[in-house]
């Protein structure tokens, strides 16, 4: 356990509980470094193995990677699971990781460790997210713009979560992604197109608002995007 606790401290996770029980529950905002922490853990200590209910890692030259979770994972003492909210985690798991703000079908467990700081996007996005009642921090620089649906050109990767928006974009032959198609992916610049002026579905809206690194453009009916 000491090696995991040491890495959690190194990566800036805040401990919430003085008493720990298995599985150790770790929550992070997007870009908080949880996947990087898991990779460092399994490369540093060969006792550990890692599986994810999200996108698995590509094969590596070391042969060590985060693999896709499946029903027949052999029971072992030091197995960790990423994106645990997305699947059925075995009760013998050593530690489980997730970003609960992105939602998922499974229950959210009480966290032993959390990290609110993102190393993906910047202060402008963090401020917008806090205005929308999500707890996120960042020290980086980025740009956020909010415009009307037809007031400016699209930029970067276009994302949406509402079916009516998808139909509109297809009608105009705009290449775009429903948010579940790109879960776990990051892009330099993103345009989020929505038919509403507030996050109707908070989990899906949060995903759309956190796929970028340097630039986010929100297109909404009245050129506003607020908590309600």
From Swiss-Prot:
MF terms (GO), sorted A to Z: ATP binding; RNA binding
PROSITE patterns: PSRV_HELICASE
Occurrences of domain (+)RNA virus helicase C-terminal (ranges): 133-228
Domain ((+)RNA virus helicase ATP-binding) ranges: 1-132
Alphabetically ordered keywords of this record: Host cytoplasm, Host-virus interaction, Inhibition of host innate immune response by virus, RNA-binding, Suppressor of RNA silencing, Transport, Viral immunoevasion, Viral movement protein
UniProt key word S-adenosyl-L-methionine: no
Keyword Acyltransferase: no
Gene Ontology biological process terms in this record: symbiont-mediated suppression of host innate immune response; transport of virus in host, cell to cell
GO cellular component term, pick one: host cell cytoplasm
Residues annotated as transmembrane: none
Subcellular location: Host cytoplasm
Main location: host cell
InterPro entries documented for this protein: (+)RNA_virus_helicase_core_dom
UniProt function note: Transports viral genome to neighboring plant cells directly through plasmosdesmata, without any budding. The movement protein allows efficient cell to cell propagation, by bypassing the host cell wall barrier. Increases plasmodesma size exclusion limit. Acts as a suppressor of RNA-mediated gene silencing, also known as post-transcriptional gene silencing (PTGS), a mechanism of plant viral defense that limits the accumulation of viral RNAs.
Family according to the record: Belongs to the Tymovirales TGBp1 protein family.
Subunit structure: Homodimer and homooligomer. Interacts with capsid protein. Interacts with host AGO1; this interaction targets the host protein for degradation, thereby suppressing the antiviral RNA silencing.
More details: TGBp1, TGBp2 and TGBp3 seem to act together for cell-to-cell propagation. TGBp1 is the main movement protein that physically cross the plasmodesma with the viral genome. TGBp2 and TGBp3 would facilitate TGBp1 function.
Protein name per Swiss-Prot or TrEMBL: Movement and silencing protein TGBp1
Organism: Lily symptomless virus
């Amino acid at each position: 356990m000491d090696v995991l606790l040491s890495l959690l401290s190194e990566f800036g996770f805040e401990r919430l509980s003085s008493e720990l029980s298995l599985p150790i529950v770790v929550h992070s905002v997007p870009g908080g470094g949880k996947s990087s922490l898991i990779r460092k853990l399994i490369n540093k200590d060969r006792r550990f193995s890692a599986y994810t209910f999200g996108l698995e890692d590509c094969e590596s030259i070391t042969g060590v990677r985060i693999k896709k979770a499946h029903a027949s994972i052999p029971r072992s003492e030091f197995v960790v699971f990423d994106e645990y909210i997305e699947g059925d985690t075995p009760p013998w798991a050593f530690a489980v990781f997730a970003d609960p703000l992105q939602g998922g079908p499974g229950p959210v467990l009480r966290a032993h460790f959390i990290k609110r700081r993102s190393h993906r996007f910047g202060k402008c996005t963090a401020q917008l997210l806090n205005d929308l009642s999500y707890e996120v921090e960042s020290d980086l620089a980025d740009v956020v713009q909010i415009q009307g649906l037809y007031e400016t050109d699209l930029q970067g990767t276009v994302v949406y979560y509402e079916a009516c928006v998808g139909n509109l974009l297809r009608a105009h032959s705009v290449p775009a992604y429903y948010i579940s198609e790109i879960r776990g992916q990051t892009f330099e610049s993103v345009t989020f197109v929505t038919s509403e002026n507030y996050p109707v579905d908070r989990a899906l809206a949060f995903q759309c608002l956190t796929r970028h690194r340097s630039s986010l453009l929100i297109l909404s009916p009245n050129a506003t995007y607020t908590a309600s």
